[in-house]
Regions:
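Nucleotidyltransferase catalytic core that binds NTPs
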Residues: 1-207
Length: 207
C-alpha cells in the first residue's frame, strides 16, 4: 500500500478526501462520493481507510488489511476514485489534520476538499487543530436525510467557506451490511460483488 501514482506524475487540481472505516464500503459510499465529485467538479476522490482513528473504537471491525482490500475493490466504480493507504500505514492514532498536511505535500499545488457529514461538521471544533486543518482544506459537508450542515456551523474561522452539497439519500449503512451478511441474506444490492467476494472468502461479519 502506498500513495497512488498520481502524486508523482499527473497532478489533479481538485482532490476530494473521503475518509471512513469502510467496514465494509458499500453502494451508498460510492453514490455520495460520486455526487460530491459531480457537484464540485473534482478530478479525484481519494478514499482513505481509517487506520486508528482517535475517536472511534475499532475492536470489532474487520482487520485493517481487509478493510483496505475492500476499499481498493470499490474504487473501480468510478474513474475519479483512487485509494491511499496513508492512514492505514501510520502507527498510532490517525488525525485528519496530519493526513491533510501529508497529502498537501504529496500533491503540491492541488486544492484539497475534505468530505464530511453533518454530524462530523457539528463536532469539528473537537478535532485536533481544527484551525490548521481548515487552512489546508476546503470543507465539503454532505447534506442528506433532511439534515442541513449550514444549520449547525461551528464557531471556527474558515467554516464560513464550507461547501454544502446535497447528496442522494441511500438507505444503506455498513451496519446494515454486516447484519445482512450475518443473517445469510443476499447483499448484492448493498455492496459491489468484488466486496462480497472478499467477505465470503474471509468469513467476515459472521458471529
Amino acid at each position: 500500500m502506498g500513495q497512488d501514482s498520481d502524486a508523482s506524475s499527473e497532478l489533479p487540481l481538485r482532490i476530494g478526501l473521503f475518509g471512513g472505516t469502510f467496514d465494509p464500503p458499500h453502494r451508498g459510499h460510492i453514490a455520495v462520493a460520486a455526487d460530491v465529485a459531480d457537484a464540485l467538479d473534482l478530478d479525484r476522490v481519494l478514499w482513505i481507510p481509517a487506520g486508528h482513528p482517535p475517536h472511534k473504537l475499532l475492536a470489532d471491525t474487520a482487520p485493517l488489511a481487509l478493510r483496505v482490500e475492500m476499499t481498493r475493490a470499490v474504487i473501480s466504480a468510478d474513474s475519479r476514485f483512487k485509494m491511499t493507504g496513508i492512514e492505514a500505514e501510520r502507527m498510532g492514532p490517525s488525525y485528519t489534520v496530519e493526513t491533510a498536511q501529508a497529502l498537501k505535500e504529496n500533491y503540491p499545488g492541488a486544492k484539497l476538499f475534505l468530505i464530511i457529514g453533518t454530524d462530523q461538521f457539528r463536532q469539528l471544533h473537537l478535532w485536533k487543530n481544527p484551525e490548521k486543518l481548515l487552512s489546508l482544506v476546503e470543507l465539503v459537508v454532505m447534506d442528506r436525510d433532511g439534515q442541513r450542515g449550514r444549520d449547525h456551523t461551528p464557531h471556527l474561522a474558515g467554516t464560513e467557506n464550507a461547501h454544502f452539497v446535497p447528496v442522494r439519500k441511500i438507505d444503506i449503512s455498513s451496519t446494515d451490511v454486516r447484519i445482512a451478511v450475518n443473517d445469510g441474506q443476499n447483499v448484492t444490492t448493498l455492496i459491489p460483488s468484488a466486496v462480497a467476494e472478499i467477505i465470503v472468502r474471509e468469513g467476515l461479519y459472521r458471529n
